[in-house]
UniProtKB/Swiss-Prot annotation:
GO terms for cellular component: cytoplasm. It is found in: Cytoplasm. Homodimer. The tRNA molecule binds across the dimer. This is Serine--tRNA ligase. PANTHER family: SERYL-TRNA SYNTHETASE. Pathway: Aminoacyl-tRNA biosynthesis; selenocysteinyl-tRNA(Sec) biosynthesis; L-seryl-tRNA(Sec) from L-serine and tRNA(Sec): step 1/1. It is an enzyme of class 6 (ligase).
Length: 444
């Protein structure tokens, strides 16, 4: 939720920010119409209360002097009816206005590219030495800005083929019991997933992040405070008969755990890494990535989250991105970082960086990390403050993926298979966690 005082004082910057996002500015018109009605109604209410106070004082004077007060009592009764009517209307306007206020997106950071479409996200940097099939070289250079790659004369096997040939997952049987986009993860691929989780937890713990496992369900109040639930609702699984949803990301319960609290200044920053399954209906992804485990209804993710003071939030944004990059550098997975353009940002984010890994079998970069600075937008919705010398202030909240395991399993399978697709090498940093150095081959 945005700051209503800032909106009133700087309406034009919000109109521009909405236009830059491709957001319908009529919602701002509706807000100001209601806000003006709220102000006018409040003015009338205060005037009537003032009149009532004056009459009440006159009644007291007349009682002391023994004068008749019946006419004044009738006036007070009439004013009470008006007050009740105006207070009811004031509450109605307040509810509607706050509902609209929740829909107005966050102000964009100055360096967010003002454009539309994922293809217009701005390249920030590239890392790694990718294996690139000859047919994909032109795309790779254009989208990485790098000439650092190894050209290969064969297309690596897709992870769909690898999990079948190496007996790493059973999607067909999962489909019998749960439908499309579910899977049984098996054998060394499952152990590799556990290794990724434990590696990421240790990695972030060493950098001062408190690891936790959040509840896997969240109530409506918390969910609507943590995210734009109207945008997210087609993605969420609702628990029938309960005020609960399965979580789509650990971000939402972590953000909500401090709702309606006032922290002490010296408690900040609070760094958290959350480990959880994520449940998503993927209603808007019909026809996309229908095979394999790249886009599924259930996956595991390690999320980074920070509560901090406003003046520190951009430093923590850089820290979150750096943490994620360092993880993928250590795994030796080639990737690029992009500054997501205004038309592709969700309502909460003032700015978002995506990290996209190179997937040589697909011949393209695909998103594996999203890092966002939500400034005070999320904290206002959840009412999370801290006590400073200048009074109570809203914290800033930031979040970033560390590892979404299924996508990284796919990245490892595509990037580290041998020429024949018979053996998948395990990244060196994961071998102490797996106890094996490859999938396939003679030692399996």
């Amino acid at each position: 939720m945005i700051d209503i005082k800032l909106l009133r004082l700087n309406s034009e910057i919000f109109y521009k920010s909405c236009r830059d996002r491709g957001f319908d500015t009529r919602i701002l018109d509706e807000f100001f119409e209601l806000d003006n009605e709220w102000k006018e109604n409040l003015k009338q209410l205060n005037n009537i209360k003032h009149d009532k106070n004056s009459i009440t004082m006159e009644i007291s004077r007349r009682i002391k002097s023994g004068d008749d007060i019946n006419d004044l009592k009738l006036k007070v009764e009439s004013l009470n009816i008006d007050i009740q009517r105006l207070e009811g209307r004031q509450n109605e306007i307040d509810v509607k206005r706050n509902e609209i206020l929740r829909l107005i997106p966050n102000l964009l950071a100055d360096d967010v590219p003002r454009c539309f479409g994922d293809e217009n996200n701005r390249l920030v940097r590239y890392y790694g030495r990718a294996r690139v099939f000859s047919d994909d070289v032109k795309y790779f250079i254009e989208n990485s800005g790098s000439g650092d790659y190894e050209e290969i004369d064969y297309r690596p096997k897709s992870h769909v083929d690898l999990i079948s040939e190496l007996n790493l997952a059973d999607i067909e049987r999962a489909g019998k019991i749960a439908g499309a986009r579910f899977y049984f993860l098996k054998n060394r691929l499952f152990k590799l997933e556990l290794a990724l989780i434990n590696y990421a937890v240790d990695f972030l713990s060493q950098r001062g992040y408190t690891v936790l496992e959040p509840p896997f369900m969240i109530n409506y109040k918390s969910m609507s405070g943590a995210t734009d639930i109207e945008t997210f609702k087609d993605t969420l699984y609702k628990i029938e008969g309960d005020d609960l949803y399965l979580i789509a990301t650990a971000e939402h319960p972590i953000a909500s755990m401090l709702q309606d609290e006032i922290l002490m200044e010296d408690e900040l920053p609070i760094r958290v890494s959350g480990v959880s399954p994520c449940f998503r209906r993927e209603a808007g992804a019909h026809g996309k990535d229908t095979k394999g485990i790249f886009r599924v209804h259930q996956f595991n993710k390690i999320e980074q989250f920070v509560f901090c003071k406003p003046e520190d939030s951009w430093d923590f944004f850089d820290e979150l991105v750096r943490n994620s990059e360092d993880i993928y550098k250590s795994l030796k997975i080639p990737y690029r970082v992009v500054n997501v353009c205004s038309g592709e940002l969700g309502n909460l984010a003032a700015k978002k960086y995506d990290i996209e890994a190179w997937f040589p079998a697909q011949g393209k970069f695909r998103e594996i990390v999203s890092a966002s600075n939500d400034t005070d937008y999320q904290a206002r919705s959840l009412n999370i403050k801290y006590r400073s010398r200048d009074g109570n202030r809203f914290v800033h909240t930031l979040n970033s993926t560390a590892i979404a395991t299924e996508r990284i399993l796919v990245a490892i399978m595509e990037n580290f298979q041998d020429r024949n697709g018979k053996v998948i090498k395990i990244p060196e940093v994961l071998i102490p966690y797996t106890g094996f150095s490859e999938i396939g081959g003679d030692d399996n």
